[in-house]
């Protein structure tokens, strides 16, 4: 879900940066901090907020010119003040850390309650009713026929989430879940007796072909009782914006970290801010994706297990399409604007609460093989593909199209992917290693949390990293933070 202004930003050549660092070893440090935090996404901002409130001297180094990481609200090129999300679009009622943060910064919570029928499109044929699904001509077993994808999912998952126990259990409990992640999600559904076409229906809307079954089951279990979804009024980027504003003078933008060296008194952190500059720190918190960690030179190197985990973790090749239309034409036909298709695409009304304009925006996300198809495309060709994908569910978009944008996360230089993608066998092996501290080095980000892929995961991991630092340094947890100690 390549969500950002990165199409206007040039990537800094990391190999050149690393080479330049080697020539500045004798130069004096330009600052000191007890803790340097790498990355001003939600994880880094939350870590910085808690440490700052606890009285810890902190400096945050951010490669981009703005905070938020993968939280990106797009306002251009849309008309009438419309906006849409190129990053996270929603969060759940179960996401306590996001709700706490939004309320702490007095940001408006907008419940998502679109009216109208949802659409599922298979074989290029959209349907919003069970009767309409007959046009799909699928080879389903008798007891699978005339059943919605959600009903099929409930049938084949059954009581299994309860068998998993507490899905929020600490990572030390992963061992008992190993049996659930030996297969991919589609393979696991087939092992439960689902027909191939039933599996196809249960996996519309995304590419789960390489995803660990445990990854999906834990998400399913944690969200099962939480049906309400929210977004932040005025744009999701208001949350990192408010958090960053409260940390004035602490964050340095356009300052990508290129090297971290352990020294006798702590660490030296080298970053580019025009020339290469350095900061001395007692501890370092890496609040960046594993894909970004691969670009930072570590001296000495991290542990073998940590290096392997960072190298092996995959990221979803997500692409986000944001399409402005003359009017929200789907509403007149009784549709909500939400749809899932068998071309690994999820679609939704991105401007449902923005009633000041007569226009509308349909957003769509695709990924996996379909997302990789966009890598060699021009922006216009990518946008055209987005319209085609949405037309599978809402054919009227072709005549209503005005303008739009596409965002390819896998080409964003500071992310290289939409969110962490755990493959079979990796959640029980990689995640505990990725989240563990190493002698003054701490690690945060959605990829280290049970809420992988959500803003909740980023905030939660930031709280964990801050807790590690405070415990290690004997400092007290800051009061009135709303976080769990």
Language-model features: locations:
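FAD-dinucleotide binding site
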Residues: 2-485
């Amino acid at each position: 879900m390549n969500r950002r202004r990165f199409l206007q930003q040039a990537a800094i050549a990391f190999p050149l940066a690393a080479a330049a660092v080697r020539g500045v070893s004798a130069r004096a440090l330009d600052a000191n901090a007890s803790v340097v935090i790498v990355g001003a996404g939600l994880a880094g901002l939350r870590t910085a907020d808690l440490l700052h409130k606890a009285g810890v001297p902190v400096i945050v180094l951010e490669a981009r010119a703005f905070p938020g990481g993968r939280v990106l609200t797009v306002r251009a090129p849309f008309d009438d003040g419309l906006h849409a999300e190129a990053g996270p679009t929603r969060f759940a009622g179960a996401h306590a850390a996001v709700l706490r943060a939004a309320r702490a910064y007095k940001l408006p919570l907008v419940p998502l309650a679109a009216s109208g029928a949802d659409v599922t499109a298979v074989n290029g044929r959209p349907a919003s009713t069970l009767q309409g699904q007959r046009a799909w001509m699928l080879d389903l077993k008798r007891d699978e026929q005339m059943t919605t994808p959600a009903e099929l999912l409930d049938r084949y998952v059954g009581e299994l989430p309860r068998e998993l126990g507490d899905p929020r259990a600490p990572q030390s409990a992963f061992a008992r879940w190993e049996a659930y992640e030996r297969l991919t999600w589609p393979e696991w559904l087939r092992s439960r007796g689902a027909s191939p076409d039933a599996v196809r229906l249960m996996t519309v809307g995304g590419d789960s072909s390489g995803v660990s079954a445990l990854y999906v089951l834990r998400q399913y279990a944690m969200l099962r009782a939480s049906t309400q979804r929210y977004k932040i009024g005025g744009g999701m980027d208001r949350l990192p914006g408010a958090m960053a504003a409260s940390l004035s003078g602490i964050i340095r933008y356009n300052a990508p970290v290129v090297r971290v060296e352990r020294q006798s008194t702590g660490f030296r952190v080298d970053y580019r801010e025009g020339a290469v500059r350095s900061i001395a720190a007692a501890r370092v918190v890496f609040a960046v994706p594993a894909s970004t960690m691969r670009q930072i030179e570590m001296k000495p190197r991290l542990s073998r297990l940590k290096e392997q985990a960072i190298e092996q973790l995959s990221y979803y090749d997500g692409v986000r399409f944001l399409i402005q239309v003359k009017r929200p034409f789907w509403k007149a036909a009784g549709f909500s604007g939400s749809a899932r298709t068998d071309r690994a695409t999820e679609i939704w009304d991105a401007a449902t609460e923005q009633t000041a304009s007569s226009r509308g925006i349909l957003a769509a996300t695709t990924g996996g093989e379909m997302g990789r198809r966009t890598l060699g495309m021009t922006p216009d060709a990518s946008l055209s593909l987005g319209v085609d994908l949405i037309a599978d569910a809402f054919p009227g978009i072709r005549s209503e199209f005005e303008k739009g944008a596409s965002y390819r996360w896998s080409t964003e230089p500071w992310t290289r992917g939409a969110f962490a993608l755990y493959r079979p066998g990796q959640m029980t092996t990689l995640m505990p290693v990725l989240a563990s501290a190493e002698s003054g080095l701490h690690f945060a980000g959605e990829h280290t949390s049970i809420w992988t892929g959500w803003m909740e995961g980023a905030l939660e991991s930031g709280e964990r990293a801050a807790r590690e630092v405070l415990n290690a340094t004997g400092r007290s947890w800051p009061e009135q933070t709303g976080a769990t100690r």
